């Protein structure tokens, strides 16, 4: 486990509200792990968007403020029968990647697309638990990328 070298870093989380009962597990786990790493829950700001497709634009607006050291986008994209969920997820991830490349603010992803999801209690319970793991992993990755970027800043100095 990495202990934060930047414990006062501000982090934004952009979360989709579709399947909020699942997605919120990621957010809660991120904040819990962030505090275990030495960060403050008060430095994590949460922003809600309707669905996954809105994450990149919202992340871009947040990145452009210069206020956040990193941004996490989280959503649960499932096949709703209207359009292909893998297309939606790919579009969201491409947008998030473009945001971080254009703004130089790391944008992490916990946008998950199960191959086959059905609204059954066993699967819902599985993904609730899985999003806890993903939230913890995202907090660890966030700490690691902030450390890596701090080392890059020393190279540029």
Swiss-Prot record:
Pfam families: DMRL_synthase. GO terms for biological process: riboflavin biosynthetic process. Keywords: Riboflavin biosynthesis, Transferase. It comes from the Bacteria. The keyword Cell inner membrane does not apply. It is an enzyme of class 2 (transferase). GO terms for cellular component: cytosol; riboflavin synthase complex. Signal peptide: none annotated. One of its GO terms (molecular function) is 6,7-dimethyl-8-ribityllumazine synthase activity. InterPro entries: LS, LS/RS, LS/RS_sf. The active site is at 84 (proton donor). 5-amino-6-(D-ribitylamino)uracil binds at residues 18, 52-54, 76-78, 109. It catalyses: (2S)-2-hydroxy-3-oxobutyl phosphate + 5-amino-6-(D-ribitylamino)uracil = 6,7-dimethyl-8-(1-D-ribityl)lumazine + phosphate + 2 H2O + H(+). Its EC number is 2.5.1.78. Pathway: Cofactor biosynthesis; riboflavin biosynthesis; riboflavin from 2-hydroxy-3-oxobutyl phosphate and 5-amino-6-(D-ribitylamino)uracil: step 1/2. Catalyzes the formation of 6,7-dimethyl-8-ribityllumazine by condensation of 5-amino-6-(D-ribitylamino)uracil with 3,4-dihydroxy-2-butanone 4-phosphate. This is the penultimate step in the biosynthesis of riboflavin. PANTHER family: 6,7-DIMETHYL-8-RIBITYLLUMAZINE SYNTHASE (PTHR21058:SF0), 6,7-DIMETHYL-8-RIBITYLLUMAZINE SYNTHASE DMRL SYNTHASE LUMAZINE SYNTHASE (PTHR21058). Belongs to the DMRL synthase family. This is 6,7-dimethyl-8-ribityllumazine synthase 2. The gene is ribH2.
